[in-house]
Structures are given as C-alpha cells and as structure tokens.
Amino acid sequence: MFGNKIKKLILGYRASSDVYINFLRKQGIEIGNNVRIYRPFNTTIDFQNPHLLTIGNDVQITGPVTILTHDYSWSVLKKKYGYIYGNQRKTEIGNNVFIGWGATILGGSHVGNNVIIGANAVVSGIVEDNSVYAGNPAKKIMSLADFKAKREKRQLSEAKAYVREYKLRFGVIPPESKLTEYFFLFKKNDDVKTFHEMLTLM
C-alpha cells in the first residue's frame, strides 16, 4: 500500500493503468471496458482534445505507445508564412484491439474492431476491421483469419521448442503452469481450471 502511494506521488496520473484511465475519463475521453495500458509511465495519450478521442472495449495498449488527436507541425508554416493551419481530428479505436510496442496512432485515424497493430507501426487513416497492420506507414499485412491460421499452424512446434529450451536451461521439464500460452494443446475445454486467469485476461 505504501509503495503504491509513493509510486502515485512520483508518477502522478501515470502511476498505473487504472489511475491513467480514470484520469483520461475525467478529462472527457470516452474509454470502454477492459482497457489495459501496460506501461502507463511512458505511454502518451493526447487529452488536449478529449472530445476527439474514443477508445472501445477490450483494448490492450503496450508501451511506449502514442495516441494523438492533433499535429503541431503547423508551427513551421506559421513561422514561414504567418498563418496557422490547425490540424485537430477525431481519433477512434474500436473494440478488441491490440496496439503493439512503440506504435503511434496519428490524429484522424480510425482503427476498426478486432485489429492487431504491430510494433513500431505508425497508423494514419482507416484501419479495417478484422485485420493485422504493421510498418511505417502502417499497412494491412493480412486478415485476422489468416493470422489465426498462421499462429495455429505453429503452436505445436513452438510449444516443443519452449519445453526443449526450458529443459536445457533448468534441467527439468517445465510444469504445466509455465505453459500458459499452449495449454489448449494438452487440456480439454472443460479442464482448464489451472489456466482460468489466461482465459479471463480481458
């Protein structure tokens, strides 16, 4: 408890995911349920224009992520030409979205539902539903269904590699509790009590 108070004193509204999200909601940003910010202390979510940002349900924000609703590059135009060309646009993030490490969501972006944004992607414009995007600028690299098929195909070989490397490092076969991402390979759907936490992460 004391440690949490010190952490909040030092980091302020970025002390934890819940503290950050509550702060953003108080500013007026619309944020759904089951949203998680994994590294709140170095994730930047623009609250200058809270009415221009909406984040849906079941959104996983890794770190350090940046989500914007504005662009200050007009300062160069102002210096050169003496005019201000404002650039404040609505940014929307849908439901069931994963935003990878180091990604940037630029102002005016619309991220659909059931979307994976790859690490260090720079998103601008429309991101289609049920898709995986990556790169700078971010582009669609596959559908979510194709990504599922790709991951499904690799599950057994990756699980075997995990077990092999664990045994090489520690000299023993890993316990079931270590195989949190592969339990569907050896557990029936009605026998997953040990892995209940993994099934209820969001």
Predicted regions and their residues:
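Terminal amphipathic alpha-helical/low-complexity segments used for targeting or macromolecular assembly
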Residues: 1-28, 33-34, 138-202
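Flexible, glycine/small-residue-enriched loop-and-beta-strand segment within the central core
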Residues: 22, 29, 36-110, 137, ...
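Catalytic binding pocket for nucleotide-activated donors in carbohydrate/polymer assembly enzymes
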Residues: 129, 134
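Short loop/turn and capping residues at structural boundaries
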Residues: 34-35, 127
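Short amphipathic alpha-helical patches
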Residues: 47, 82-85, 120, 157, ...
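Beta-rich strand-turn-strand
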Residues: 101-116, 121-125
